[in-house]
């Protein structure tokens, strides 16, 4: 299985840099096996059945991009350097691993000042990343970070425009609850409260799980033999209540439909033994063609990058040829791609 098998040509103008407004006006490609239909997200209730269960990732994206100044007293007088920081993940002590640019301009124990309220001290450097200790914690840290930080937009958006205040709402789901992600579970960005209410009124059920999406989600696959690729790890949690709800849906013969690849990867991690159980920890599950799905019956997801692990995941679910047809159709019909783009509802043909 070669990396080039998952490549395709994508016109630059199909890469979305802003979301559809309103959220539910985004287009929705519905694929039932080899049958493809064009719809819109607001019509999602018409494609689902009473008793279907949507599994939603309730992680909250933090404004992880910070710009600050390193101050240093020298023989020539006070000097400062502009420092850019992207927070990656916290450790058990509350310190943050971070990408620091330029890292060489900050010494161990030096302080970076981001605002009147927020500053951090460099405590260590490991594998090219800094370890930062902030002056605040808990709600105080969250408030100061929200004021000083910018949303960590994906590279394919950030290279086209800077993040702004709109992104603080656009790049956050309406049900975001547990802070810790540095990338959004983007399929969930299409939902608003009215759509959630309409789905519930139609008998669609919901379960919430948490997977803190990390910056590693944007890392390219660098090996030609995809089976040798090593996935990045991300922290996730499936509660006992969510596991029981999902199992009840399976036992009732109804469909479990994760919204987004993060929710899918998490429930398949928790369901490796055939039945989903309460689970918490770091998952590095890598789903590619040949994978046996134990939990997910379908998937709602956006359109993914060529040669990405997510292209491999949807190919595992739907079939390689089916995904080629889906993406050919999406390009021909000018669907918008990636995080702020349109959505797809993928329903595999079961034997």
From Swiss-Prot:
The keyword Lipoprotein is assigned to this record: no
Subunit structure: Monomer.
Biological processes annotated in GO: queuosine biosynthetic process; tRNA wobble guanine modification
NCBIfam families: PRK00147.1, queA
Name of the protein described by the UniProt record: S-adenosylmethionine:tRNA ribosyltransferase-isomerase
Record function comment: Transfers and isomerizes the ribose moiety from AdoMet to the 7-aminomethyl group of 7-deazaguanine (preQ1-tRNA) to give epoxyqueuosine (oQ-tRNA).
Pathway listed: tRNA modification; tRNA-queuosine biosynthesis
Keywords: Cytoplasm, Queuosine biosynthesis, S-adenosyl-L-methionine, Transferase
A cellular-component GO term for this protein: cytoplasm
Enzyme Commission number, as recorded: 2.4.99.17
Sample GO molecular function, one term: S-adenosylmethionine:tRNA ribosyltransferase-isomerase activity
Catalytic activity field: 7-aminomethyl-7-carbaguanosine(34) in tRNA + S-adenosyl-L-methionine = epoxyqueuosine(34) in tRNA + adenine + L-methionine + 2 H(+)
InterPro entries in alphabetical order: QueA (IPR003699), QueA_dom1 (IPR042118), QueA_dom2 (IPR042119), QueA_sf (IPR036100)
TM annotation in the entry: none
Protein family according to the UniProt entry: Belongs to the QueA family.
Keyword check for DNA repair: no
Subcellular location: Cytoplasm
């Amino acid at each position: 299985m070669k990396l080039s098998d998952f490549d395709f040509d994508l016109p630059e103008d199909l890469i979305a840099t802003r979301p559809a407004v309103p959220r539910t006006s985004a287009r929705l490609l519905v694929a039932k096996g080899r049958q493809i239909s064009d719809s819109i997200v607001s019509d999602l209730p018409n494609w689902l059945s009473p008793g279907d269960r949507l599994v939603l990732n309730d992680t909250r994206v933090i404004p992880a991009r910070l710009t600050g100044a390193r101050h240093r007293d020298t023989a020539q007088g006070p000097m400062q350097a502009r420092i850019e920081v992207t927070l990656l993940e916290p450790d058990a002590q509350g310190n943050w691993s971070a990408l620091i640019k330029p890292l060489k301009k900050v010494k161990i124990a030096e302080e970076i000042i981001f605002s009147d309220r927020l500053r951090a001290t460099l405590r260590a450097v490991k594998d090219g990343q800094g370890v930062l200790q902030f002056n605040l914690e808990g709600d105080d840290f969250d408030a100061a970070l929200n004021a000083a930080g910018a949303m960590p937009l994906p590279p394919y958006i950030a290279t086209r425009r800077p993040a702004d205040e709109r992104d603080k709402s656009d790049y956050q789901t309406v049900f975001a609850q547990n802070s810790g992600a540095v990338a959004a579970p983007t399929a969930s960005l299409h939902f608003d409260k009215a759509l959630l209410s309409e789905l519930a009124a139609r008998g669609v059920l919901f379960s919430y799980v948490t997977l803190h999406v990390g910056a590693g989600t944007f890392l390219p696959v660098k090996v030609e033999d995809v089976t040798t690729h090593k996935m990045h790890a991300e922290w996730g949690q499936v509660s006992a209540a969510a596991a029981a709800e999902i199992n009840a849906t399976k036992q009732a013969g109804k469909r479990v439909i994760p919204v987004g690849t993060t929710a899918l990867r998490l429930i398949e991690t928790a369901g490796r033994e055939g039945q989903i159980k309460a689970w918490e920890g770091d998952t590095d599950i890598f789903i590619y063609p040949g994978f046996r799905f134990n939990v997910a019956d379908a998937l709602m997801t956006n359109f993914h990058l060529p040669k990405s692990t997510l292209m491999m995941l949807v190919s595992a679910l739907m079939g390689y040829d089916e995904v080629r047809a889906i993406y050919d159709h999406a390009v021909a019909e000018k669907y918008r791609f990636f995080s702020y783009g349109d959505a797809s509802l993928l329903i595999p043909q079961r034997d």
